[in-house]
Amino acid sequence: MGWITEDLIRRNAEHNDCVIFSLEELSLHQQEIERLEHIDKWCRDLKILYLQNNLIGKIENVSKLKKLEYLNLALNNIEKIENLEGCEELAKLDLTVNFIGELSSIKNLQHNIHLKELFLMGNPCASFDHYREFVVATLPQLKWLDGKEIEPSERIKALQDYSVIEPQIREQEKDHCLKRAKLKEEAQRKHQEEDKNEDKRSNAGFDGRWYTDINATLSSLESKDHLQAPDTEEHNTKKLDNSEDDLEFWNKPCLFTPESRLETLRHMEKQRKKQEKLSEKKKKVKPPRTLITEDGKALNVNEPKIDFSLKDNEKQIILDLAVYRYMDTSLIDVDVQPTYVRVMIKGKPFQLVLPAEVKPDSSSAKRSQTTGHLVICMPKVGEVITGGQRAFKSMKTTSDRSREQTNTRSKHMEKLEVDPSKHSFPDVTNIVQEKKHTPRRRPEPKIIPSEEDPTFEDNPEVPPLI
């Protein structure tokens, strides 16, 4: 059985960002709704309302929907037209395939002056004699009835014959009401008989029968002591019984009434619950995965089945997990232990035994914003065990070394010694060399007599040889 809840309306209001109070169109078809409620309080601005193919038996709680223009109540269990006077803007009403037998109840629509279209096909009243003439004469504002346009001549004839048609419609209504009363009594009687049969089946004897045969019971008890029937056979017999009951229900002829529709709904609900119970039984509860054995030894487990890489350096161990890129970080839980690391990804454990002992307190876990990978850095413990004695290595970090270097520098004053011959840059002063001033006229070279020629005489009047 379906109820109109706030959650149901919000789920069907995605086109309005799940906002209820400003909804103008709402579709609640095929929700097995049996009663109209809460809509007039939560969605007062509705203009279009779809409620077809439900189990609504009465039109109610819609009088506050002043802006409602189209109401679809096809394929329901409505037997009377009522409580629509408050829908002032109602222009179209669809009541196809219902159980409306009181045709005179359409007089309640005379106050809806904007009503232009009405659908009543598939109802018991549609088979009455002079049904169309009565509706056309009763509702002068109508322009379309059952998808056919109402012509002025048709309305004039209906108004002329209204005094004759009305008593005939009243008689047909009375006959229909008597038939409905009989059908209701038969439905109640069948329902009571079915309840009694169910009580008998549930309160049957220990042997599953209402008679007691001593020989049969003794033989059954002895057989139970010696041989136990397997569970599969019992399950098969139950399954056969259920299938037989189901076939019997669907093959049983019945009238198309509101009670029969409700009965089919109840039967479908029972079958659904049985299937849910069977599926719950079939579901095998997975045993808890063993991460640490009874001896205290950690195991390697990769239940989420993700890729990973492990890098073992001298100082630290780096684990790179290929976590899904768009997974929320709140779904990841990291636990670093001295000998193993455990990562819970959406409740599934990933555990890896480390090749060396690490420091859990100094470990860090970071996640990449581009790839989504999880990188866990785990520094190693500087402890080496040799021959029963423990020798501790002082694992100095870069910060400790830098501190020692600064302390030694502060103790000894260092001076900067520079060799001018080892300059890496040129001397700016020697880039351009100054040229000495030379006269334009070259001096005449002096003729120096060679010592080898003793007969040489210098004559100044003779020009020099070139």
Swiss-Prot record:
Give positions of region: Disordered: 185-206, 268-288, 391-466
Instruction: Note whether Nucleotide-binding occurs among the keywords.
Output: no
Question: Any idea where the CS domain is?
Answer: 301-396
Q: What Pfam families does UniProt report for this protein, alphabetically?
A: CS_DNAAF11_C (PF23602), LRR_9 (PF14580)
- Coarse class of the primary localization is cytoplasm
Location in the cell: Cytoplasm; Cell projection, Cilium; Dynein axonemal particle; Cell projection, Cilium, Flagellum
The outcome of changing C87R is: In CILD19; no effect on interaction with ZMYND10
Q: Where are the transmembrane segments?
A: none
- GO CC annotation terms, alphabetical: apical cytoplasm; cilium; cytoplasm; cytosol; dynein axonemal particle; extracellular region; motile cilium
Q: Where is the composition biased (Acidic residues)?
A: 450-460
The source's domain of life comes to Eukaryota
Q: Where are the LRR repeats?
A: 22-43, 45-66, 67-88, 89-110
Task: Give the compositionally biased regions (Basic and acidic residues).
Answer: 185-202, 398-425, 433-445
Q: Which cysteines are joined by disulfide bonds?
A: none
InterPro entries given for it? CS_DNAAF11_C, CS_dom, Leu-rich_rpt, LRR_dom_sf, U2A'_phosphoprotein32A_C
**What is an annotated GO biological process for this record, any one?**
axonemal dynein complex assembly
* LRRCT domain sequence ranges: 123-161
Q: Which UniProt keywords apply?
A: Cell projection, Ciliopathy, Cilium, Coiled coil, Cytoplasm, Disease variant, Flagellum, Kartagener syndrome, Leucine-rich repeat, Primary ciliary dyskinesia, Repeat
Q: Where is the composition biased (Basic residues)?
A: 269-287
Tissue specificity, per the record, is: Expressed predominantly in testis and in nasal epithelial cells.
Parts forming coiled coils:
178-204
Q: What is the similarity comment for this entry?
A: Belongs to the tilB family.
Assembly notes: Interacts (via CS domain) with ZMYND10 (via C-terminus).
Disease named in the record:
Ciliary dyskinesia, primary, 19: A disorder characterized by abnormalities of motile cilia. Respiratory infections leading to chronic inflammation and bronchiectasis are recurrent, due to defects in the respiratory cilia; reduced fertility is often observed in male patients due to abnormalities of sperm tails. Half of the patients exhibit randomization of left-right body asymmetry and situs inversus, due to dysfunction of monocilia at the embryonic node. Primary ciliary dyskinesia associated with situs inversus is referred to as Kartagener syndrome.
The job of this chain, per UniProt, is described as:
Involved in dynein arm assembly, is important for expression and transporting outer dynein arm (ODA) proteins from the cytoplasm to the cilia. Acts as a crucial component in the formation and motility of spermatozoal flagella.
Q: What is this protein called?
A: Dynein axonemal assembly factor 11
